[in-house]
Amino acid sequence: MNWLLVIAGAAAGAPLRYLTDRAVQTRHDTVFPWGTFTVNVTASLLLGLVAGAAGAGAPPAWVASEQVVSLVGTGLCGALSTYSTFSYETLRLAEDGARLLAAANVAGSVLAAFGAAALGAALARAVWG
């Protein structure tokens, strides 16, 4: 039954990724992929919250349930974030001669996503731990 929850989460996450990416990117007049950066960091924060809540045994019990992890963690966050687009956009930056932006995208994305996941987990522990 959890596979249905993963599908439901992904059905929400994929269009949310597209809409967020377009909304963010159209507000920036740059080749830097701010839309992809935003969805990846947001998904990392949300996944940190979900994993932190599950690890802390958050009450009510549904918050830390396997179903919520499947729906939000695997489904929504999995579809919201996009490693393949991040990789392709970084490659495109490098091939177009924007090597500094490509390097900034790699370093910034990894650091920001890791920081967001850690922040999400810390917030969950502060609330439910």
From Swiss-Prot:
Q: Which InterPro entries match?
A: FluC (IPR003691)
State the Gene Ontology BP annotations.
cellular detoxification of fluoride
- UniProt lists the gene as fluC1
Kindly list the places in or outside the cell where this protein is found, as annotated in its UniProt entry. Answer: Cell membrane
Protein name as it appears in the record: Fluoride-specific ion channel FluC 1
**Molecular function terms from GO:** fluoride channel activity; metal ion binding
Role summary: Fluoride-specific ion channel. Important for reducing fluoride concentration in the cell, thus reducing its toxicity.
Q: How is its activity regulated?
A: Na(+) is not transported, but it plays an essential structural role and its presence is essential for fluoride channel function.
Q: What GO cellular-component annotations does this UniProt entry give?
A: plasma membrane
The record lists the catalysed reaction(s) as: fluoride(in) = fluoride(out)
Q: What Pfam families does this protein's entry cite?
A: CRCB
Q: Which family does it belong to?
A: Belongs to the fluoride channel Fluc/FEX (TC 1.A.43) family.
Residues reported to bind Na(+): G78, S81
Q: Which UniProt keywords apply?
A: Cell membrane, Ion channel, Ion transport, Membrane, Metal-binding, Sodium, Transmembrane, Transmembrane helix, Transport
**Where are its TM segments located?**
43-63, 68-88, 100-120
